């Protein structure tokens, strides 16, 4: 779902600077959340935040793109703009950074010499959930577009994970529910529990609920038994079959409910080596944790 900001709300937000955020460990401090919540006194802010929440947790929902492009044009993409994006995120859940060596917002640029399948690579970034091998993955992953690929590539892709699972055979689903999968490393992480290895792709929740712990990268980079690999490959095919894709524009803020949707990115356009490093695609990533007792991400 794409959500436009009403023009009067945009004008009011431009005139309402927010204070710098403070962190409690790696989480946005409650004092900052309370200060940012003063934006609810602006007409249409709460209504817009409610639309955002419904798009993420309402029936049939699971992702939203908040169109903040006019705010980015007016304010630039520096601290003032990022504070506004953080304020909207805090209406959904608690912003945090699981990476101790990174700031709250993690910069995802383009590195032409990086593994093409990585988030900062230039190739196809297949469907996955972030921090798939943590016992408590972020409930939401969010991406703020600072600059799209100037050559026109790299549309975002999303797919309803539970809808894809529902199209599989009962045999494949039973294999995906076995603790037989593993992927990646786990170090210097905070707020996401412990390493989960091995893990099931389906966690035994009722149909349509819980995480679908999947990353297509494990099909190539993890040693899996043949039957389990085949079941995971079938899931990957169904995710592609049900995908939606769109190009993020400057200021677009994509928020994904990880309990419902998996995400990825098509390859960037060829010729990235001709684009100066300072002119390549840039996204900023922020993670969110559902509040204690909040079933909104279930």
Go through each PLM region and give its residues.
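Active-site environment of non-heme Fe oxygenases that use a 2-His-1-carboxylate facial triad
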Residues: 1-51, 59-62, 105-298
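Long, mid-chain structured domain cores
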Residues: 37-107, 115
